[in-house]
Amino acid sequence: SSSSAASDVYKRQVYLDGEAFFDVKKDNGRTFQVVTELVEVKVLGTRFDVRVSEEDNMAEVVLESGSVKLNERNKAEDGVILRPGEMGRVSRQSGIEVRHVDLQLYTTWKDKYMNIESQKMENVMFMLSKRYHTEIRIEGEELKAEIFSGRFDIDQSLENIFETIDLITPIHYQQQPDGTYLVTPK
């Protein structure tokens, strides 16, 4: 997985393929815009995450603070305004869908440390899969529902993080031939 961006500073416009977190300061008279293959995000002053997945043919925008307006690319309709804690998912098939999300699940990848507070293990694995750009499958309903708290230095290898989790919640992890990981209870 990779991200690439090109920008036009005069227009305050960024073209994005991948994922990026933005902390945008208000500039009277000039909006900030992120353009992807599927969505245009118009901003005044805010903090938000944009992830584009060509593989899944969709884009996600998660708003941490402020507000943003989402429009499907090359569509004339009014679009949708997101509020903090909301995610807008845009796909060619279903248009724009908005739902409330736990920000911790979508924005911790940008920090040096991943702070996890009282999250279900399936959410922990979701955050790790985003950070390490690999699929992590978890088996066992009890393990999925297990509540976990911890702090990881994101410069560690995924295997080291699995070993740390194992000290608190007994797990077994195995890398599969296709490069994905399977996590099961011990």
Protein language model regions, located:
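A residue-level detector for the "anchor" residue at the start of short, highly conserved motifs
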Residues: 7-186
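Positively charged, low-complexity/disordered segments
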Residues: 2-6
